[in-house]
Amino acid sequence: MKKELILKALKLRDMGFPSGDIAEELNISVKTALYLTLNGEELLKAGETPKEDSEKLDIFLEWDNVRASSRRLRNISKIICDMLSDVEFDGIVGISSGGVPLATLISDELDKNFSIYVPKKHVHTEKEKTTGFIGQNMSSIVGKDVIIVDDVMTSGNSVKETIKYLKGIANPKKVFVVMDKSGIDEIDGVKIEHLFRTGVVDIKK
């Protein structure tokens, strides 16, 4: 288990993040997030994950070297633009926060309307929040055909929430993610497209 991942999970836990939000932030499953928040200190002391728990571990995706560079992000956005060549749409919605930089670059490249969806996990309020909201240029996508962009899809919860919200004001046609860990091809009738997808191969000795 990577020490940096454990430390990030513990830091988010101490900041008050629930396991579901930690999972989304670190691109890991909810079970893995819960495991790290409950056992992180012991794992750090031990220096490695106990063998009996190894089958419970999840795949951790890190692409900081890409998203830290606007030039590299633009190259990724051009690949997505190429994948969009046969899709007719009016606007792009980036899911906050990871999908926003890519959605911005894609909208600039294709000269499309741009908007942001802020999931409920990023809405900090004393009252329980049941949904997120459109954070920018809502009027530009109302009644329009739109695509949704995010960086990593882990459980699919944020994408599902975004699709549900947008169906009330627009027509979501497709979802594009850079990396997919969920294995989900479609949510509520909306197709999921990915650049990369992870999977687990069970090799028995």
Swiss-Prot record:
This protein's UniProt keywords: DNA-binding, Transcription, Transcription regulation
Domain notes: Contains an N-terminal DNA-binding winged helix-turn-helix domain and a C-terminal regulatory domain (or effector binding domain) resembling phosphoribosyltransferase (PRT) domain.
Signal peptide location: none
This protein's record includes keyword Transmembrane helix: no
Keyword Oxidoreductase (UniProt): no
A Pfam family of this chain: Pribosyltran
BP GO annotations: pyrimidine nucleobase biosynthetic process; regulation of gene expression; UMP biosynthetic process
Protein name as catalogued: Transcriptional regulator GfcR
InterPro entries: GfcR-like, PRibTrfase_dom, PRTase-like
One GO MF term attached to the UniProt entry: DNA binding
Assigned protein family: Belongs to the purine/pyrimidine phosphoribosyltransferase family. GfcR subfamily.
